[in-house]
Every structure is written in structure tokens, then in C-alpha cells.
């Protein structure tokens, strides 16, 4: 394990986007290092079935919350995905869940494209996905 982040590359079945448990791993790493004050160094990266994604913590110590690695969160997220993924796709489904259900802020989603460019994927207040190229 990298001291600042975690990479997840084992695919037992097609994985399309992060889950609450992945968010929990990120939050736990940050919580352990809460006194460092430099939260921008923490991330979780995964190779998903539709690309490589990174979650990066961009919040403050007030945004650190753990406890999302439970079966209850897993089951609820699976049900949520069954309802919304066909309509919204996985990026929008995940970001909506993060904002509306988990009520988390201070976490940014990035997609590493096949041409090695990186886009920050954000959700507007009108629930539209915006992909902003990173410099």
C-alpha cells in the first residue's frame, strides 16, 4: 500500500465505478493521517471495466467521515445502482450517491483516459456531468 493512496486492480467481476467501501478506504487513510494537515496527497485509484478512475480528497478535516464499508452501505448502493445506472451511467450515479445519499463533499473524481489525459468529472447542481481536462 502506498502511504498516500491505494490502488485497486483485481477484477473478480466487472467493476464500473467506486463504491462506498472504496470511499471508506480513502477516508480511513486520511483519518489515520489527520494530523498531517496536507490532505491533497490522498487518493484511491482503481482500474474499472470502463476506464481508470481516481478519487482524490480535496476537503478539510471537517469533511473526513468513515463508516461506509458496511454491508448495509454495499446493499443500499447496489440497489441504487440498479435503479439509476442505466439512466445516468456509472459516473453520474456514483457522484449523485456521494452527494445526495452519503452527503459527502471534498472528494473529487478523475478519469484517466486511454490517451493518458485526465479529466475531472463533476456533477453540477442541475445533475449534469462536466468533464474538465486537467493541465
Predicted features, each with a name:
Residues 1-135:
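Active-site-proximal loop/helix of nucleotide/amide-processing enzymes and allied scaffolds
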Amino acid at each position: 500500500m502506498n502511504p498516500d493512496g491505494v490502488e485497486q486492480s483485481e477484477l473478480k467481476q466487472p467493476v464500473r465505478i467506486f463504491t462506498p467501501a472504496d470511499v471508506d478506504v480513502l477516508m480511513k487513510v486520511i483519518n489515520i493521517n489527520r494530523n498531517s494537515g496536507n490532505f491533497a496527497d490522498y487518493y484511491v485509484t482503481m482500474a474499472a471495466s470502463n476506464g481508470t478512475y481516481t478519487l482524490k480528497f480535496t476537503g478539510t478535516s471537517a469533511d473526513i467521515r468513515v463508516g461506509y464499508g458496511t454491508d448495509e452501505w454495499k446493499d443500499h448502493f447496489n440497489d441504487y445502482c440498479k435503479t439509476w445506472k442505466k439512466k445516468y451511467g456509472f459516473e453520474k450515479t456514483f457522484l449523485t450517491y456521494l452527494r445526495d445519499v452519503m452527503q459527502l463533499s471534498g472528494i473529487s473524481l478523475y478519469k484517466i483516459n486511454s490517451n493518458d489525459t485526465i479529466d475531472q468529472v463533476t456533477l453540477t447542481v442541475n445533475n449534469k456531468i462536466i468533464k474538465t481536462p486537467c493541465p
